[in-house]
């Protein structure tokens, strides 16, 4: 992950502990198979699952996030005009941005917000690429959900950058991806 909040650094420095618990055989077999497929140990996979629960699933549920089929979201958003999509992004940011930041990370900073976005992207299984070149951070997110979703997310991120008073940033889009470029001074 490219950006880390203060809480992430604190958690990392706290060390580890051992714990023993029982897992049903069929579940453990699935975990072993998935770990083998990902070329990881079962321990690493279980730690990633627990971390994902603590850093995303648990706080996201409290913040009002749910799971939706990407195809369904694409169908719905493709019914809207560009103006309606922009209006939805504006209303959503205006009504939910601050609440979401506090519910997910108990702080309302740009770094904590971006940490949340990255956690959501990873948890949702979207492909992304991060570069840090010449004092600029670039995040490319491949949604594969069509032009209208790209327009929504690009607009959403522009509004987020405005909200956090991030200057020298740029959001671009293609039919299936959103590109966010931010100068290093803000990260």
Q: Model-derived features: where do they sit?
A:
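Short Lys/Arg-rich basic patches
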Residues: 1-24, 35
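Short, basic amphipathic alpha-helical segments that act as recognition/interaction helices
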Residues: 30, 40-63
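An N-terminal amphipathic alpha-helical segment
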Residues: 70-139
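Short, hydrophobic/π-rich interface segment
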Residues: 123-174
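C-terminal edge-of-domain segments
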Residues: 172-187
């Amino acid at each position: 992950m490219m950006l880390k909040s203060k809480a992430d650094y604190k958690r990392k420095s706290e060390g580890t502990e051992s714990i023993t618990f029982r897992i049903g055989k069929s579940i453990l077999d699935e975990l072993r198979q998935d770990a083998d497929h990902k070329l990881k140990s079962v321990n690493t996979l279980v730690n990633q699952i627990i971390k994902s629960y603590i850093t995303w699933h648990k706080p996201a549920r409290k913040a009002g996030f749910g799971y939706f089929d990407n195809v369904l979201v694409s169908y719905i958003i493709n019914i809207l005009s560009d103006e309606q999509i922009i209006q939805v992004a504006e209303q959503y940011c205006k009504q939910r941005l601050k609440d979401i930041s506090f519910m997910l990370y108990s702080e309302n900073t740009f770094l904590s917000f971006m940490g949340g976005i990255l956690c959501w992207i990873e948890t949702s299984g979207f492909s992304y690429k991060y570069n840090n070149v010449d004092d600029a951070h670039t995040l490319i997110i491949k949604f594969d959900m069509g032009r209208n979703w790209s327009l929504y997310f690009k607009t959403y991120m522009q509004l987020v950058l405005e909200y956090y008073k991030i200057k020298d940033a740029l959001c671009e889009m293609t039919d299936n991806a959103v590109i966010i470029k931010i100068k290093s001074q803000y990260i």
